[in-house]
Structure formats: structure tokens, C-alpha cells
UniProtKB/Swiss-Prot annotation:
PANTHER family: GROWTH ARREST-SPECIFIC PROTEIN 7, PROLINE-SERINE-THREONINE PHOSPHATASE INTERACTING PROTEIN 1. GO terms for biological process: clathrin coat assembly; clathrin-dependent endocytosis; neuron projection morphogenesis. It comes from Homo sapiens (Human). May play a role in promoting maturation and morphological differentiation of cerebellar neurons. Residues 100-171 are annotated as: Disordered. It is found in: Cytoplasm. This is Growth arrest-specific protein 7. InterPro entries: AH/BAR_dom_sf (IPR027267), F_BAR (IPR031160), FCH_dom (IPR001060), GAS7_F-BAR (IPR037957), SH3-like_dom_sf (IPR036028), SH3_domain (IPR001452), WW_dom (IPR001202), WW_dom_sf (IPR036020). GO terms for molecular function: identical protein binding. The gene is GAS7. It comes from the Eukaryota. Keywords: Chromosomal rearrangement, Coiled coil, Cytoplasm, Developmental protein, Differentiation, Neurogenesis, Phosphoprotein, Proto-oncogene, SH3 domain. Residues 1-62 form the SH3 domain. Residues 196-456 form the F-BAR domain.
Length: 476
């Protein structure tokens, strides 16, 4: 696939990546490397190179194929007078009548009133007011419209400043807790950012109902809770090993004390030697367990306890960062709703004054209409600006969510691997302790094999004999 070209779907800052490629939505990139893992390397038309998420771009059908820019189709396809063609951010072409401000997905025919495709229904816009549709979007879309931060959402979704209509936008998107998603009834199949993995960055975009209350918990909050739970589990494992160490130390002390016990110290012969070695082996075993407990402390317990000492503080900063972006998004959404309401009121006022003009023509009414038209236009501009700021805020939140969830994913893998390695070290030390313990009883085994009751009896008799002349019968 190297050498193929792609078009960017979303803006990407690349600020948090050392070799990230910064781009806006709609730019062309030539692919240089396309390894597995979800990150590709590419080169922009200005020569800048860098890495970017593969899910942020859409491959063109063939290497070198570039969709024509807005308005270019009119050079190859003859349109009726007054019509211009444009591309939506999803690549679907639509048409605008510069005279009537009518917008349609169907290519107009040269004959007035006849669609390009027989039997097709033209999806045209409602009447415009001062160059703005009912949704507050301009009838003539600028070529550099800012795209919303949604992943693939289909041809007929809200197109930002080039939306066909408010009704169509409402049917294709749904806003939940100030985050805009594709409508579930019309949602096209979305490509996962990391389709071959159950990655955090793909499954925690929505909020979840709080089982302990009537509120909701953000998906990112669930990930943070898992991270903090992992830190707590790591701490409890360290405490468990500490208890294990305490048991080893107490066991070693008791073994050493028992080895000094004088019970059966008067046993003699080869059995006495074996018994003495049994007591000595207890002292040796006590030393082995003391060393085992010391290694457990330095090589298992301490690393588990000290791993990521500032983890909670770091997670708190991360939580605040994403929460601030979410608050900003909520603020932008409130501004959009306020601007939308203001536009509706201005349009209603303009419509009312227009009706008054039809009833009674007067200079005062015409002046009122001009003022109402200016206010309606300003309200449309305000709504466009608010929607653009909202989309920018959602784009920033989207990018930070992807980056941060992937970082949390990496941290979780790192934590699990660290614990696994130290538990392996624990089992290794345990095996070594068993071997050392075995070595302490080997001398005992050797002496026990040498125990000879007959030899012991001989030695004892030689040392304690009282005479070998046996008694005889008494004579009369």
C-alpha cells in the first residue's frame, strides 16, 4: 500500500507525538509506511513527513486518485445555468443553485424541473432567509468547512457549515451528554481504530449509567477506576508478600531456637551423631529461611510497593485534563443551543415582519424587515461560529481521548507484566529455598544411613562394661 494516497477525515495536531504529522481535515497524504498497529507514516504535499492514526484518514480508491475539489465538476459535466457542485467532507457531491439557494444531492438536468435520474426524488433544502437555511448554515458552503470529530458517519450526516438541512442533521446524529454520535437508526458501520484488538480507545466513548445512583459515569472514568484498582491490587500484593516474609522470619527464629534445645542430647553412638545433625540442620534451615525472607523483601515486596509511587497523582492530573475538555465541550454545546434558539427567534421575527409587509406596504415595515434580516444573518453567523467552536472542542476531546486511552492501555500492560515478573521471581526464590533446605538434610540422611545398632552396642559395652565373667552355680 506504500505509495497510495489518502485524504484526512479529521484534524490531527500531533503535539503529543515526537514524530507526529500535523494536518487539517481534507488534506492529501502520500503513504510511506503502513505497518500493523494503527499508525501510518505519510508525507503531505508540502513535504512534511510524520506518523498519524490510520483511522484519521480514508484511502482513495487507487494510488494517485484525487477527488475533484468543490466546483470542479462543472468543468467536465455541464450543469444548468446557476448551478454549482460541491463535495461534502464524506466525499459525496451535492449541488447548489446560486439563484434560488436550493440544495440537492441529485445532479440537476438541463431541463428545468426534471431531475437527472428518472423517478428520483430531489432532496432540496427548505427556503433560505438571507442566505441561511433554517439550521443557520450558509446556503453557499465555504470550501474549507470544519468537519465534526465523528468517525465515518455516512454521506447524509451533519456536514458542519455545509449541512443540507437541520432536519436531516437531526435524523443522522444524536447528542448524548453534549457528545454528538451517529443516530442509531441510520448509523453506518464504523471502522474501529484498532479492529484486531479489544482496545480501550474503541469501546469507552459513551457514558454509562451509574449503578449506585441516577447519574452517569463517563467511559474514561471507568478506565481511570480500573487503573486505580490495579494500583490498589498491586499494593495488596505487596502487603501479602510482607506477611509471607513475616511468617518466614518467625519460622526461622523458631527453628534456630529449637536447634538449641537439649532434648535427647545424651543419645550416644551413631544414632547420637545423627540426632545431633538433625538439630544442626534446623539451624542451617533457619539461616536459609532468613535469607529467603530478605530476598523476598528486596526483590519482590519493595518493587511491588514502590512501582509508580506517584501513580494516583498522575491519574488525577489525567482525569482533570479530560474532564476539563469535557466541560469545555458542554459549554460549547450550550452555546450552540442558545445560538440555535436565537436564530429561530430571529427567523420567526423576520417572517412575521415579512407577512406584515404583504398586508400593508410602508417604509417603516421595510426598514423593520431590513433590521430583522440583519439580525437573522447575524444569528446565523453566530450559530455557525458556535457550531465550529463545538466541533473544534469535540475534535480536541476526541484526539486526547484516543491518545490518553492508548496510554492507559500501555500502562496496564506494563503493570501486569511487572507483577508477573516479580511473582516469577518469588517462585524462583522459593525453588532455591527448597534446594537449600534439601542440602541441609542431606548430612542427616548420610548419618542415618550409617546408624548401626550392633556397632553402637559394641562401643557402649566397651565403655561401660562391668565384667565379662559370668556367674556359676554355688558349690556345697
Amino acid at each position: 500500500m506504500s505509495g497510495a494516497r489518502c485524504r484526512t477525515l479529521y484534524p490531527f495536531s500531533g503535539e503529543r507525538h515526537g514524530q507526529g504529522l500535523r494536518f487539517a481535515a481534507g488534506e492529501l497524504i502520500t503513504l510511506l509506511q503502513v505497518p500493523d498497529g494503527g499508525w501510518w507514516e505519510g508525507e503531505k504535499e508540502d513535504g512534511l513527513r510524520g506518523w498519524f492514526p490510520a483511522s484519521y484518514v480514508q484511502l482513495l480508491e487507487k494510488p494517485g486518485m484525487v477527488p475533484p475539489p468543490p466546483g470542479e465538476e462543472s468543468q467536465t459535466v455541464i450543469l444548468p445555468p446557476g448551478w454549482q457542485s460541491y463535495l461534502s467532507p464524506q466525499g459525496r457531491r451535492y449541488y447548489v443553485n446560486t439563484t434560488t439557494n436550493e440544495t440537492t444531492w441529485e445532479r440537476p438536468s438541463s431541463s428545468p424541473g426534471i431531475p437527472a435520474s428518472p423517478g428520483s426524488h430531489r432532496s432540496s433544502l427548505p427556503p433560505t432567509v438571507n442566505g441561511y437555511h433554517a439550521s443557520g448554515t450558509p446556503a453557499h458552503p465555504p470550501e474549507t468547512a470544519h468537519m465534526s470529530v465523528r468517525k465515518s458517519t455516512g454521506d447524509s450526516q451533519n456536514l458542519g457549515s455545509s449541512s443540507p438541512s437541520k432536519k436531516q442533521s437531526k435524523e443522522n446524529t444524536i447528542t448524548i451528554n453534549c457528545v454528538t454520535f451517529p443516530h442509531p437508526d441510520t448509523m453506518p458501520e464504523q471502522q474501529l481504530l484498532k479492529p484486531t484488538e479489544w482496545s480501550y480507545c474503541d469501546y469507552f466513548w459513551a457514558d454509562k449509567k451509574d449503578p449506585q445512583g441516577n447519574g452517569t459515569v463517563a467511559g474514561f472514568e471507568l478506565l481511570l477506576q480500573k487503573q486505580l484498582k490495579g494500583k490498589q491490587m498491586q499494593k495488596e500484593m505487596s502487603e501479602f508478600i510482607r506477611e509471607r516474609i513475616k511468617i518466614e522470619e518467625d519460622y526461622a527464629k523458631n527453628l534456630a531456637k529449637l536447634s538449641q534445645n537439649s532434648l535427647a542430647s545424651q543419645e550416644e553412638g551413631s544414632l547420637g551423631e545423627a540426632w545431633a545433625q538433625v538439630k544442626k540442620s534446623l539451624a542451617d534451615e533457619a539461616e536459609v529461611h532468613l535469607k529467603f525472607s530478605a530476598k523476598l523483601h528486596s526483590e519482590v515486596e519493595k518493587p511491588l510497593m514502590n512501582f509508580r509511587e506517584n501513580f494516583k497523582k498522575d491519574m488525577k492530573k489525567c482525569d482533570h485534563h479530560i474532564a476539563d475538555l469535557r466541560k469545555q465541550l458542554a459549554s460549547r454545546y450550550a452555546s450552540v443551543e442558545k445560538a440555535r434558539k436565537a436564530l429561530t427567534e430571529r427567523q420567526r421575527d423576520l417572517e412575521m415582519k415579512t407577512q406584515q409587509l404583504e398586508i400593508k406596504l410602508s417604509n417603516k415595515t421595510e426598514e423593520d424587515i431590513k433590521k430583522a434580516r440583519r439580525k437573522s444573518t447575524q444569528a446565523g453567523d453566530d450559530l455557525m461560529r458556535c457550531v465550529d467552536l463545538y466541533n473544534q472542542a469535540q475534535s480536541k476531546w476526541f484526539e486526547e481521548m484516543v491518545t490518553t486511552t492508548l496510554e492507559l492501555e500501555r500502562l496496564e500492560v506494563e503493570r501486569v507484566e511487572m507483577i508477573r515478573q516479580h511473582l516469577c521471581q518469588y517462585t524462583q526464590l522459593r525453588h532455591e529455598t527448597d534446594m537449600f533446605n534439601q542440602s541441609t538434610v542431606e548430612p542427616v540422611d548420610q548419618l542415618l544411613r550409617k546408624v548401626d545398632p550392633a556397632k553402637d552396642r559394641e562401643l557402649w559395652v566397651r565403655e561401660h562394661k562391668t565384667g565379662n565373667i559370668r556367674p556359676v552355680d554355688m558349690e556345697i
